[in-house]
Amino acid sequence: MSLLSTAIKTKYTHSRIKHKGRMGIVTLFTALVCMACQPVSDNKSDTENDNSQPTASQPTQTSNSQRVNSPAPVLNPPLQPLAQPITTPITILAIGDSLTEGLGVAEQDNYPAQLQAQLREAGYSNVSVVNSGLSGETSTGLVNRLDWALKTQPDITILTTGANDAMRGVPVTTVDDNIRTAIERLQASGSTVILGGMEIYDNMGDDYVNQFSRIYPRIAKDTGVAYIPFFLNGVAGDANLNQKDAIHPTKEGYTHVVRNNILPVLMPVLTEVVQEKSSNTQ
């Protein structure tokens, strides 16, 4: 079980999430190896190694009585179909760790796969969402493999890193520097970046949590990237939307993440990118 799983597991089983301001924003985590940098419709093999040598994030069993039962969140409806399908080729790179991999769910049920399916059903017929994550990865590992991930030539990147840094107590300045480096390199490649956030709990110590909570909104403001404040909003802590490990979402949990958390931020970005690409080809 990874440090991420160990540290988060305890707090996910508490009866409520303790917020302090927006305590502990960290970036989302994604998971298939970049060797799996293929559109989500392709088969991928999992790996648990990265350049920073993280431990694998494996589910651990907890009893249902230990899991948090929350009121069922209101699920946004699917996207409305476009009047005219958009055939402009669009590549979206989802990069992070195990939550993007979809640990514990079928390949077609992870968030990149569901996101691609929803976009195509709505009329974005030539969109591909690439699942490029690494379980247990730190922000240093992500930066070290970024050139590999960029071979997919993404138009849009959903960037989610930093959770495993927090679990290891990596200095906040290191995490900040790595995320900024990743954003700079992604933007330099021509990719529009969406920064995904995650909340951590006070078991890491108030001082660290408070410092960590300032990283992501500050970076989003400084760089002007689109921003998802809490990637698992409405899902974290809900026993009905998480697997027995109380960490990784179920298929239904990922549906909520896609419809309620990703699409409201992604769609304005996608519309702008499509318009820009269409005008450049005319």
Residue ranges and their predicted role:
Residues 125, 141-282:
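Alpha-helical cap/lid subdomain in secreted, periplasmic
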